[in-house]
Amino acid sequence: MNQTKFTFLVPSYKASFLEEALGSIKNQTFLDFKVIVSDDCSPEDLKPIYDKVCGGDSRFAYRRNDENMGGKSLVSHWNLLVDMCDTEYLIMASDDDVYEPIFLEEMDKLVQKYPKVDLLRAKAVRLENGKVVLKDGDIPEYQSQDEFMQYFGVKKMVLCLANYVFKTEVLKEKGYFPDFPTAAFSDSATAIHMSRNGIATTKDILFTFRISNENLSCAKNYSKNAEKGVWANLMFLDWYGQHFHQHYPYDDFAFGIEQYHLPRLPFCKMFKYYCEFRKRGYMKQIRPNLTILKNWFKLRLL
């Protein structure tokens, strides 16, 4: 294991915010880290941005995939980088999100305070096209896995990937990131899995999660990948059942499927997947009434 403590892994494809993202990593007040910037065969020229921001910093390294991986599987690129990581902890960063300068400094304090936890998290704010739409609420500094699950996807919490710090060897032992379509729920599944020994969270917001028209997560691009998103829902629920031997416990998940995911599909596919959710025994509370139909028509009349 490398003596350096942390590695930022930065799978990169978009140029728009890369300079700001890399600058926020370079400007960390805690200096014991290194960075692998991995160009996913982008059609945009990312290397000059890398050279401008951090080309002279020996902690940073740049590589480029011979072929694009993210178009087929974002998670395969993540896991390739996890394989390259040789430090005790890793952060799966991105090409457009921003860290506060004391992000790593505060994370290291939590590492020292809670050495047995395998997962740490910075509180976050979510931006959509430049506007704040969600901030983390009150979250305890330490939570057991059960306590974390009471918050996850239910309480006021920004769900994303790049604000987590993972213990590298444990992530590898648990099988890396699960590969769901468009990487939907891959981060959530990993966070849940890695929280077995608890999770430590910063008291302040130290991370900005950016959603723009270039993200798969934005509504416009999600609609293009709606069927993959619904399939990822099913894969996540299957994964949860395999690891925890019970159905995913929260009604909020069913609400999201009913209100957001299924109505984005063409009608016949919507009905097909609705039946699949019911057949597998997931979310019996998905109601056989007009709610999904109402949302289906509403989306098409906008």
Annotated model-derived regions:
Residues 26-66:
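Acidic donor-binding segment of Leloir-type glycosyltransferases
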Residues 1, 260-302:
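Membrane-interface aromatic/basic loop that binds lipid-linked glycans or pyrophosphate carriers
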Residues 102-135:
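Conserved donor NDP-sugar-binding/catalytic core segment of glycosyltransferases
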Residues 11, 143-223:
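Conserved nucleotide-sugar donor-binding catalytic segment
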Residues 143-146, 152, 183, 205, ...:
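Catalytic core of nucleotide-sugar-dependent glycosyltransferases
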Residues 66-85:
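Glycine-rich, basic loop-to-helix element that forms the pyrophosphate-binding segment
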Residues 14-27:
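Short, well-formed alpha-helical segments that are part of the catalytic scaffolds
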Residues 90:
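Short aromatic/hydrophobic "clamp" motif used to bind/position activated sugar donors
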